[in-house]
A protein has these predicted regions:
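Regulatory modules associated with amino-acid/nitrogen control
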Residues: 1-192
């Protein structure tokens, strides 16, 4: 019924644990709040069920300036995510003060393929690392009405690479021809 959101300090970083019913706007909301609080994302583990009840489990290693978030900030982030999911907190309005949401990402590459191991449609999104990148990617995914059910993240030499395993609208598998169109559409949405 209600989202489970916990933030714990682990060594020099904070770890956010999240569980809820998966919906296409979820990651947009979560990453929007993290961007609004100026948090850095170091790693992302995401597992989503592909059958009812379609729950998603997320573990994010995050920090503020490379350090553990103060307890008060962690509590505010937790509350903000909860309020955003309930529609009581407009994350876009808060972000518009911090970022130019219309400016694109630099050197965007997108590629669609069907993963032979997971047998799921996958989308590779790569761009130069910059604040708000995750939010912009997840916002574009939401605009396309896609559901992320697994994700891999790699940050290397100033580039961020996300591999997102997806279901299409109505939790359907995405055929190749449509996936290629989606990849192209995402690239346009995200580029300068």
């Amino acid at each position: 019924k209600e989202a489970v959101i916990e933030i714990k300090a682990e060594s020099s970083k904070s770890v956010l644990y999240f569980a809820y019913r998966n919906q296409s706007f979820l990651l947009n909301d979560i990453f929007g709040v993290l961007a609004a609080y100026g948090l850095t994302i170091h790693s992302l583990s995401l597992y989503g069920q592909i059958h009812a009840p379609m729950l998603v489990f997320i573990k994010l290693v995050i920090s503020r300036g490379g350090k553990v978030m103060p307890q008060k900030t962690a509590e505010n982030v937790r509350k903000a995510i909860k309020e955003t999911l309930l529609g009581r907190f407009e994350v876009e309005e808060m972000l518009a003060l911090e970022f130019n949401l219309d400016s694109g990402l630099k050197k965007v590459e997108t590629n669609f393929y069907v993963d032979r191991v997971f047998h799921l449609p996958a989308l590779l999104v790569e761009a130069n690392s910059q604040p708000g990148l995750f939010y912009k990617v997840m916002n574009a995914i939401w605009q396309e009405d896609l559901l992320v059910v697994n994700a891999n993240l790699l940050v290397l030499r100033g580039r961020t690479r996300l591999i997102l395993y997806l279901l299409g609208p109505n939790e359907n598998l995405i055929p190749e021809y449509l996936g290629t169109k989606i990849a192209e559409s995402l690239k346009q949405r995200l580029s300068d």
